[in-house]
C-alpha cells in the first residue's frame, strides 16, 4: 500500500519540481545593461593648453610702447563669471603648474621682441677713459660724499659718427656698476681704462626710447573647451587637496613685476601669513612667503638728470646722462620699521609652526652671488634699482626676546642704479636702460618674500637661519598662480542604463548646435549623475555660442595688430586659441557622428555593458556617484568602449543599408506608379520591335532560299492543305460520311496584316508556354507542400513519441527509486523493530533462563 501511494503522489511531485525549476531560472536571470552616451556632463581632466591674455590696456598711457604688449590682449570681461563647485575636492600643485612655465616663456618672448628693433651698442665696446665725478657740494654730511665717491664716472671714448670713416671723441656718464677696469698700470694720472660690463660675453641692446616697463595686470585665459580651476581655501599651501573650488575663464590680474628678494604689488593672504615650499625639509627649495598685510616701500632717485644723445653710426643714437643738476645723492628706499617688524613677527610664527616651536629664527643677509641676488632689484619708472637689504634681514628671534627689531623709525635702504642689465631670462644677452630725466620716485607694496634656509653641518639643532633669495622669476609668477590649474572639459560621458537602441531606422543627422558651457554647467559637478542627467539640455545649450563669442573677441584683438609688421606672442597665442577651440568642438561632434549620436544629448546604443568595466549597480551609479567619480571609475576602459561604439555603429549602418534595399520590395504599390509604367512600356516596345525585326530577317532569308531553289510562292502566308494519309480519304461515298475537317488557309496580303499574324502567333505561343509552366510550378508546389506537411506530421509524432518515452522512462525510474527507497525503509524499520523487541525481552529471557536453571 505504501508503494502505491508513493507512485500516485510522485506524478504531482514531478510537475511541481518542473514549475519550481522554471521559476528559479527566471528569477536568476539578471537584467542586461547597455552603454548610453551623454553629451554635456560636468567632467574634466588636467590639461596643458595654450593660454591667451586679457587686459584693460586702454586705462594706461598710450604714448609709450609697453613692453608687455597688453594692447594685443583681448579686453577684460566687465562681469567675469565664477562658478563655485559644491561637493568637489581637487588636487593642486603650484610647483608643477604649466601655467607658470607659460608665463615665463611669454615674458621672455615679450622682452626679446621689445628689444628687437632697438639699437645694438656693440660700437661702445671700446676703451673708456674714466674719472670719478666728484661734484658733491652743498651736502650736509660728509658720509654722503664718501658713499657717492666713484658712483658716477665721466668717461671719454672714440666712436664712429654718422659718417663711418670719421671717428670723434665723445664724453658720457656711466654708473660705477656698469663699467669694469681694464688695467690699473697708470699711476701718474687720475683716470683708468675701463670697458662696459658684459661686453666680453653678451650683446648689449639699448632699450628703445619709448618703451615702458610699467607693469600692467595681465589676465591669463583659457580657450573654449578648457577652464581654470581656482582654489579658494584661505590657508591653502599650494600643494594637496582643496575643498573650496570654483571655475573661472581667466585668472585675476597678475602684474609681471621682475624683482628679487621682495615680491611687490602682488596679492595678499586673506587671513594669516602663508608660507609655501615644495619641500620644507630640503633647504635647496625656495620658501615663498605671502603676507596678509602689505608693507609700503617708497623709493627715490633724488638727482635731477638730463639726457643727451650720441650718434654711434648711421641712424643709431646712444642715449646717456648729459649732466646732473643739483646735489649728487644716493638713491634710496624707505620702509617703516614698525610695519616691517610686525611682518617679521608673523613670519617667524609660521616658520616655527613648520620647523619647531622651540626654534630660534635668524634672518641674515644674502650669502653672495650676482648683484641681482645679493640686493633687492626692481624697476622704478624705467631705472633699475639695486637696494641693499641688510637692515631688513639682520635680526634674531628667540623664544623670550628679539634682537635688533626695536624702534619706530624709518629704515633707509641705500640703493644703486644700473643701466646695463644682465637679462634674467637667458645667458648672453644684456640690456642698456637709457637714463630717465628728472627726479624719480615710486611707491610699491611688499606683499611677499622669497627666502632660503641654511643647511649643512654649521647649523645648530635649535636655530634656523633664513636669507633673502630670488633670481628665478618662476617663483614670482608662482606666488600668484599657486591657486590655479588648467583643466580640459570632457562633455562626453558614458554610463550603463537599461535602454537599448532597438530599431534601425533612417535618420537625418543635424548639425550639433548643443554642447557643454565651459563654465556654467560645471556648477553641477558635485551633483549625482542622475540629477545632472535631467538638466543636460540647459547645461549643453551654450557651448557653441560661447565659442563664437570668444572667437569674435580674439579676432578683434588680432585685427588691432594688423598695422604691426609681426604679431606679438599674444597674437600668436590668440590664433592658437581660436584654432584649438574649434578643434575641440569638432572632435566631440565627430565622435558623436561616428557613434550615430549627432544632435542628441542622451543617445542609447546597442553595445552591452561589460561588468568588468564596473560591477556597481545602477542605483549606486546614478544615486550615489558624481560624474567625476564615475569617470575615474571607468577611465581605463574609455578607449575600449569608444572602439565598441564605433564598431556597433558601423554594423548598424550596414544593417540599415540592407534594410533600405529590402524596402523596394516592401512597397508593391510603387509598381503601379506612372514612372514605372512608362519604363514597362518602353521595355515592351523594345521586345516587340526586336521580335518583329527577327521575323523580318528570317522571312527575307526564307525568300532568298526559295528563289535560289527556282520558284517563289504567291504570298508570304500561302499555306497548302496537308494531304491526308492513305487511311483517311478525302470524302465518303454517297456524300453521307463526315465532312472534311481541314480549315481553309488564310491568305494574308499587306505588311500590317503580316505583322499582326506574326504577333498573334507569338502571343498564342507565349500564352501556351506560360500556362504549361505555371501548371508545372503549381503541381510542383502542391507535391512539395504535401510532402512537407507529411514530413512535419511525421516529425511531430516522432517528437511526441520521444517526449512520451522520456517521460515514461523518467516516471518509471523515479517510481522504481521510490519503491526501492520505500522497501528499504520498510526493511530498516522491521530490523529496528526486531532489535527493539529483542532489547525489551532481554530481562524476560534472563528470567526464563534462571527459572530453567532452578528447575
UniProtKB/Swiss-Prot annotation:
Residues 510-531 are annotated as: Fusion peptide. Residues 1-31 form the signal peptide. Glycans are attached at residues 87, 129, 140, 154, 158, 184, 190, 200, 233, 244, 265, 279, 292, 298, 304, 334, 341, 358, 364, 388, 394, 400, 408, 445, 458, 461, 610, 615, 624, 636. Keywords: AIDS, Apoptosis, Clathrin-mediated endocytosis of virus by host, Cleavage on pair of basic residues, Coiled coil, Disulfide bond, Fusion of virus membrane with host endosomal membrane, Fusion of virus membrane with host membrane, Glycoprotein, Host cell membrane, Host endosome, Host membrane, Host-virus interaction, Lipoprotein, Membrane, Palmitate, Signal, Transmembrane, Transmembrane helix, Viral attachment to host cell, Viral envelope protein, Viral immunoevasion, Viral penetration into host cytoplasm, Virion, Virus endocytosis by host, Virus entry into host cell. Residues 661-682 are annotated as: MPER. Disulfide bonds join 53-73, 118-208, 125-199, 130-155, 221-250, 231-242, 299-333, 380-442, 387-415, 597-603. The keyword Cell inner membrane does not apply. Residues 387-415 are annotated as: V4. Pfam families: GP120 (PF00516), GP41 (PF00517). This is Envelope glycoprotein gp160.
